[in-house]
Amino acid sequence: MKAVIQRVKEAKVSVEGRVVGEIGKGVLVLLGVEIGDGCAQADWMAEKIVNLRIFADNEGKMNLALPEVKGEMLAVSQFTLAGNCSKGRRPSFDTAAAPEEANRLYSYFMGQVWERGVPVQSGIFQADMEVSLVNDGPVTFILETPPKR
């Protein structure tokens, strides 16, 4: 499982011109589910992102996590994160999870974020989406779950 995390002042996702998810201060998470990912990877990713200390404290240091700043999450499914561009000019998506499994784990991930006390909004799985955001920093991280054993 891979994620791109961006600290934002605000973010929204629209489908066919209609806003389907919107947050204020928090993180935009682009989430890619790969073959072999399961609940353990989604749990790890939710725990890591919710508790990642990427917000400034009173001294300006990155020392606070989403719950401490009352931040929100906008989660957007992004199968292209599983893309392999090492050969040729067209990406290969051989490692992307099947849509049914990816949707199940995407939904499970969002549930785990909610259970950890962070409000989460989302896009629509497999929809053609437009994502708008105001970066804060910018601060961007790429996370990948530890290798499966």
Swiss-Prot record:
It catalyses: glycyl-tRNA(Ala) + H2O = tRNA(Ala) + glycine + H(+); a D-aminoacyl-tRNA + H2O = a tRNA + a D-alpha-amino acid + H(+). Its main location: cytoplasm. Pfam families: Tyr_Deacylase (PF02580). The keyword Cytoplasm applies. InterPro entries: Daa-tRNA_deacyls_DTD, DTD-like_sf. One of its GO terms (cellular component) is cytoplasm. GO terms for biological process: D-amino acid catabolic process. One of its GO terms (molecular function) is D-tyrosyl-tRNA(Tyr) deacylase activity. It is found in: Cytoplasm. Its EC number is 3.1.1.96. Keywords: Cytoplasm, Hydrolase, RNA-binding, tRNA-binding. A motif (Gly-cisPro motif, important for rejection of L-amino acids) lies at residues 137-138. It comes from the Bacteria. PANTHER family: D-AMINOACYL-TRNA DEACYLASE 1 (PTHR10472:SF5), D-TYROSYL-TRNA TYR DEACYLASE (PTHR10472). An aminoacyl-tRNA editing enzyme that deacylates mischarged D-aminoacyl-tRNAs. Also deacylates mischarged glycyl-tRNA(Ala), protecting cells against glycine mischarging by AlaRS. Acts via tRNA-based rather than protein-based catalysis; rejects L-amino acids rather than detecting D-amino acids in the active site. By recycling D-aminoacyl-tRNA to D-amino acids and free tRNA molecules, this enzyme counteracts the toxicity associated with the formation of D-aminoacyl-tRNA entities in vivo and helps enforce protein L-homochirality. Homodimer. A Gly-cisPro motif from one monomer fits into the active site of the other monomer to allow specific chiral rejection of L-amino acids. Belongs to the DTD family. NCBIfam families: D-aminoacyl-tRNA deacylase. This is D-aminoacyl-tRNA deacylase. The lineage of its organism: Bacteria, Pseudomonadati, Thermodesulfobacteriota, Desulfuromonadia, Geobacterales.
